[in-house]
Amino acid sequence: GGAVIMRAFILESCAALVWVMAAINLAFTVLLLRRYTRERSPILLCMGLIALGLFYDALVISLGGVLEGPLLAALSRMRFVSHGGLIPLLFPICAYGLRAGKPVLTGVWIFTALVMAAGVAEGFATVLELSRVGGITRYVSAETTPAWAETVGSLLSYGTVVPLIVCGVAVWIRDRTPTLFLSGFLMFAFSALGPATGNFDLIFFISMAGEICMVLCFHLYGVWASRKAART
């Protein structure tokens, strides 16, 4: 059926498609950081840094189609470290989106710094092993990775996106923009799509599509915020 054809297409085209995804992530990174330099809005800086981290993530996966050996291993190690260090920025994005007061923002940033430290530690502690799929060599977390690092990794994946969805609903109701909600919801939906369809070997690829949806929604939020500021 259609699912089988789609899977075959992804496996055949994977090595090329990940380069396209990396380029799209780079484009949104530039758009977000340029908007930040114009408007100096801290939420845009957080969004731009997450987009930058996701671009690096996609770039290293893309390089897995042409690179092997110690260089790819070192780049992959930094992929885990940057993911652990930057994804917690979703917490301040929630706080800025809700227009939280200074005491709440201070608390959120202290909490974020602690989660970042745990995320970076998790990135260095993760035991890497080779995985090959669709012409791409990737370093992934091995079964020998310490249990605490696995737990931190899982919390970073889901414990950051769920608050984004909840805060996104509140922002949607108050400000009438679904962009923050959709950024979290689409990321969560794509993360679940791989396991739900039984394509466990393609979870990384399907999640990359979710990441693009997330940074697209970040960009749309930035556009909305700019227009709102221009009207007031």
Give residue spans per PLM region.
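Membrane-interfacial loop-to-transmembrane alpha-helix junctions, especially the N-terminal start
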Residues: 38-53, 104-108, 174-185
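A generic, lipid-embedded transmembrane alpha helix
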Residues: 48-66
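Alpha-helical transmembrane segments in multipass membrane proteins, preferentially the mid-helix core
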Residues: 27-34, 90-96, 141-178
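Non-cytosolic membrane-interface motifs at loop->transmembrane helix junctions
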Residues: 70-81, 201-211
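C-terminal transmembrane-bundle signature of multipass membrane proteins
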Residues: 160-232
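Hydrophobic transmembrane alpha-helical segments in integral membrane proteins
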Residues: 6-28, 154
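Membrane-proximal helix-loop-helix units in multi-pass membrane proteins
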Residues: 95-162
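Internal transmembrane alpha-helix with an interfacial aromatic "cap," most often the third helix
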Residues: 26-36, 60-71, 81-112, 218, ...
